[in-house]
């Protein structure tokens, strides 16, 4: 599943470079042309952030452009604050980013607030759509591309395949508390149970209470 997500990220980034943001004028080499900001999780989490980062690396190295990531500090409730998200977007722009990858719906409001201020920067928001704080009405901004995956379906397939591969003691650990992580976890449990019912075998499931939200 991680490799599949990485492939999707590579394809999305390549698509962006080829047509979505075509016509951008060339500029001097930025400090870091492509910047990914995580949702607070690290890029070796074995989950969503790592998949996204692998995709960013693969594309950037093939294209021969500079890249890096930032891992913001989350609050005590394991969530990334709006203020922190916006500070890291400002930092990325200050460091010369031309493309900012945001692999989580926790950036929806931050992108809504910041993207119009940096119209020469291209934003890629994964599993989210920009909207104002306190208002879920989607906004469409010229320099923002939104890429959505069905997290529930992806989790279901992963759980189903895990049991079909012979695993009967399973666990799920989300990177941080978020809607996407929760949906993926819920799908994982459902897929594992569906496969267990088909095979007629018992399957146990453990999870981290602080992270997984059902």
Which ranges hold each PLM region?
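A residue-level marker of the well-folded mature domains of exported/periplasmic proteins
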Residues: 26-214
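Short, low-complexity disordered leader/linker segments with a strong preference
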Residues: 1-33
């Amino acid at each position: 599943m991680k490799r599949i997500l990485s492939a999707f990220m590579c394809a999305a980034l390549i698509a962006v470079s080829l047509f979505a943001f075509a016509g951008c004028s060339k500029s001097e080499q930025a400090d870091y042309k492509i910047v990914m900001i995580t949702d607070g999780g690290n890029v070796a989490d074995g989950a969503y952030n790592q998949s996204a980062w692998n995709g960013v690396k693969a594309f950037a190295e093939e294209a021969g452009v500079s890249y890096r990531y930032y891992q913001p500090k989350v609050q005590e409730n394991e969530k990334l604050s709006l203020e922190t998200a916006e500070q890291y977007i400002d930092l990325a722009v200050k460091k010369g980013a031309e493309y900012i990858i945001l692999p989580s719906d926790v950036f929806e409001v931050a992108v809504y607030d910041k993207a119009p201020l940096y119209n020469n920067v291209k934003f890629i928001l994964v599993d989210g759509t920009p909207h104002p704080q306190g208002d879920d009405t989607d906004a469409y901004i010229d320099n923002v591309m939104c890429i959505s995956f069905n997290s529930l379906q992806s989790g279901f397939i992963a759980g189903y395949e895990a049991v079909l591969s012979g695993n009967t003691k399973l666990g799920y650990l989300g990177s941080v508390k978020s809607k996407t992580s929760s949906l993926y976890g819920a799908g994982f449990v459902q897929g594992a149970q569906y496969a267990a019912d088909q095979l007629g075998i018992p399957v146990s499931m453990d999870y981290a209470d602080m992270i997984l939200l059902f």
